C-alpha cells in the first residue's frame, strides 16, 4: 500500500494541550501537511483528539501516537481516529487498528520487527529512532522490504537533513521536536511546518 496522503510528512505534536491543539493543527495543515499525530503521552489527549477530528478530519489524516494497548485502539476508533502510530511492534494493536479500517504505522528497527508488523497488517513502517541508525541503514533495510510499503524516518529529522532520508528510500518522515515543542508559539509551528514542506518538495524534485 502506498501512503495515502498527498504529503508524506507526519506532524507529531507531542505534549500539546486541548486549549492549543486546534491552532497548531490548523497551522501545519495551512502549511500543507495532511497527516497529524497526537501522542498519547500528551496532556488530556482524550479531549484533543476528538476536537481535532471534528475540526480537521475532512482535511487531514488525524491520528494518535505512542499507542501501546489494544484497548487504546478501541477508544481511538470511537473518537474517529484514522491513523495509529506506535513506538514498538504489538501485533494485536496492529490487527485491532486494521480491523477498524485505520492506517497503522508501527515503529521498528530490524527486518524481523518490520516483517512481524507487516504480517499483522501494518500498511506503513516507521524506523525509530532513525538518528541512531542513519540513512544508509534504512537504505539497506528497504532492500528487503516490499517495494509498496511506505517507510518513514522518525527521530532526528530536520529540514536540513530531510533530503538524506528521502534519498535513502524513505517515503517521508515523522516530525517531532524540530517541528513542535510543547508550549511553543503557533507562529513557530507555522514557520517550521513551512520549512519542512519546502525541504520535502526540494528533495523530491
From Swiss-Prot:
Enzyme class: lyase
EC code: 4.1.2.21
Disrupted-gene phenotype: Deletion mutant cannot grow on D-galactonate.
Keyword hit for Lyase: yes
Expression induction: Part of the dgoRKADT operon, which encodes proteins for the metabolism of D-galactonate. Negatively regulated by DgoR. Expression is induced in the presence of D-galactonate and galactose.
InterPro entries per the UniProt record, alphabetical: Aldlse_KDPG_KHG, Aldolase_TIM
GO molecular function: 2-dehydro-3-deoxy-6-phosphogalactonate aldolase activity
Swiss-Prot/TrEMBL catalytic activity: 2-dehydro-3-deoxy-6-phospho-D-galactonate = D-glyceraldehyde 3-phosphate + pyruvate
Residue numbers marked as site, Plays a major role in determining the stereoselectivity: 154
Keyword Lipid metabolism belongs to the record: no
GO biological process, one term: D-galactonate catabolic process
Pfam families xrefs: Aldolase
Residues the record lists as binding 2-dehydro-3-deoxy-6-phospho-D-galactonate: 14, 66, 126, 156, 176-177
Function: Involved in the degradation of galactose via the DeLey-Doudoroff pathway. Catalyzes the reversible, stereospecific retro-aldol cleavage of 2-keto-3-deoxy-6-phosphogalactonate (KDPGal) to pyruvate and D-glyceraldehyde-3-phosphate. In the synthetic direction, it catalyzes the addition of pyruvate to electrophilic aldehydes with re-facial selectivity. It can use a limited number of aldehyde substrates, including D-glyceraldehyde-3-phosphate (natural substrate), D-glyceraldehyde, glycolaldehyde, 2-pyridinecarboxaldehyde, D-ribose, D-erythrose and D-threose.
Subunit structure: Homotrimer.
PANTHER family xref list: 2-DEHYDRO-3-DEOXY-6-PHOSPHOGALACTONATE ALDOLASE-RELATED, 2-KETO-3-DEOXY-6-PHOSPHOGLUCONATE ALDOLASE
This protein's name: 2-dehydro-3-deoxy-6-phosphogalactonate aldolase
Organism of origin: Escherichia coli (strain K12)
Gene: dgoA
